[in-house]
Amino acid sequence: MIVIKIGGSIVDGLHSSTISDLKNILKQDKVVLVHGGGKDVTIIGNKLGKEQKFIVSPGGVKSRYTDKETAEIYTMVMSGKINKTIVRLLLSNGISAAGISGIDGSTIEALRKKKLVVVNDKGRKMIIDGGYTGKINKINTLLIRNLIEGNFVPVVSPIALSEENEFLNIDGDRAAAYIAGGLSADKVIFITNVNGLILNDELVKEITYDKAKESLPNIGHGMEKKVMACIESLDMGVKEAIIASGDVENPVSSALFHTNCTVIRK
């Protein structure tokens, strides 16, 4: 089984061969898709008059601040517009697909973050309310497994259910990692807009789990999240984590053959 995470910035820019490539993969393996889409959330939120706010952690990681209204917009865009657009694309090309969110079937449960430590414009640390952002603490794979057994490709949006049954914004890369772990997947592939991890101006084609952990302080913040998700997936028993570009011919097969991408193993 393979779990594939499609980054939000790449959903509209996938290579034209992606669908035929996926159809060929499905002849021999089961696939689960997890998607992002933060850019669309920002655009639609602003159109609705809800300015999207971003915060920076002490480690320099930028993320969306999710208050209650933003959580509703996030849920609407992720599970409505983006998820169903991907499902429609798959169906129109002869791939049986079913779109769900992490809410459905309690697929992804998370603990709501009560407080967040952020850095303000003056570089000072502040503690603010955690809003509606979650840390994944449980994956229930029954619904996904039932869809797979029915020969559907599950397409999952990264929204989690809190302990108080609230919608929570969760990181899409980590959602893919946890789903891969929960399904005991053989591989998880993070399809993005770059070829993989760059260190010292060179593409890292293969790296061990231990070396990946050691390298985290030297990795740019966008890629750092993906490498952390790779590490977490390996911790949960996934055999191989791959970071690869979606803008190449047959991107999934290319990643599986380790062509011009980053492969992380224990």
What does each model-found stretch correspond to?
Residues 2-62, 66-266:
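C-terminal catalytic "cap/lid" subdomain
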